[in-house]
Amino acid sequence: MLFYFELVVILLCTKLAGDISVRLGQPSVLGKLIVGIIIGPAVLGIINSSELIDELSEIGVLLLMFMAGLETDLEELNRNLKSSFAVAAGGIIFPFIGGYVTGLLFGLIQSHAIFLGLLLCATSVSITVQTLRDLGKMNTRESTTILGAAVFDDVIVVILLAFVMSFLGTQDVNITLVIVKKIIFFVSIVFIAWKVVPWIMKMLVPLRVTEALISAALIICFSFSYYSEMMGIAGIIGAFAAGIAISQTEYKHEVEHKIEPIAYAIFVPVFFVSIGMEITFQGIGSQLWFIIIMTLIAIFTKLIGSGLGARLTGFNLQSSISIGAGMVSRGEVALIIAANGLTANLLAKENFTAIVIVVILTTIITPPLLKKYFV
């Protein structure tokens, strides 16, 4: 029964907060993120994390990235692969150096400083996607480059994580297996998207049941996400790939039209609130300067690194800054890496709490940055 009450509070508060945010000239997602902090454990404590909320949140982010895939122009994505790789590379090199040096300056041991640098390399564009949708900028060269860069970033960071945990952590990681799995994933996903997805859609859509088309689309979305997770890649990459696959079929516009109400009615609002709920202010007094400095390093190294990658591949200064801003959010990807670091003794418990706050702050700052720089 408590869950029903929590759901009422989440849906009501996110809609009101989103409206207030828009009235104040900001993307609606900013208000939804802030309301998660307010109604979560950090302030009012009305909503607490639970397995049900976590699961709804996971579905929310998958549907968000699925819709991003549906809206992505595949030809534009292919044209901007070079730029996407440069943006991802800059967004990994600069944050790694910044995080590593900052860790050493705060007295962290070598292995912990290296892991801290790796943690700042992560990028999660789910908040960026929502903000760009709010701004009506999803079908631009800049947004396509950001999405492509996020895929490169995820793969490179996962491989680097395997290296770091193998050499510095307590876990035994087979690096060759990690790399081979990534190659198998991308080769197989291209084949499945090209050959299997159209066949599945044609088989399931004619079924004489209610909303067979949407059920077929969701089956593909969640299957891709499951396969992605199974191969050691974030589920959001699989959902994004599923969206691109369906966007190449005749069903693209109908799926897009019908999925959006399902996603935004319940799942996506829960996802935004769940991010804000991760913040806790307990015991942060001793970590305050660490949090402030790390947040600034996290923001500016992505902004400069990814922005430089865009600038070097032909974007003008304004577009380069907007692309850098789109890569700032660390989101759920960094939280997963941080949890792995805690388990492998590569991240101290007090630093883990601080990093969670840093990750949330980078996520909250992303919508206003995009609003300011995305023309």
Swiss-Prot record:
> What does the record say about its membrane topology?
Multi-pass membrane protein
Q: Which UniProt keywords apply?
A: Antiport, Ion transport, Membrane, Sodium, Sodium transport, Transmembrane, Transmembrane helix, Transport
MF (Gene Ontology)? antiporter activity; monoatomic cation transmembrane transporter activity
Q: Where is the signal peptide?
A: none
Which terms does the UniProt entry file under GO BP? proton transmembrane transport; sodium ion transport
Q: Does the keyword Membrane apply?
A: yes
Is Transmembrane tagged as a keyword?
yes
List, alphabetically, the InterPro entries matched. Answer: Cation/H_exchanger_TM, K/H_exchanger, Na+/solute_symporter_sf
The record's comment on protein family reads:
Belongs to the monovalent cation:proton antiporter 2 (CPA2) transporter (TC 2.A.37) family.
Purpose: Contributes to the success of spore outgrowth from the germinated state during alkaline or Na(+) stress. Does not have a significant role in germination.
Kindly provide the name given to this protein in its UniProt entry. Answer: Probable Na(+)/H(+) antiporter GerT
Gene, per the UniProt record: gerT
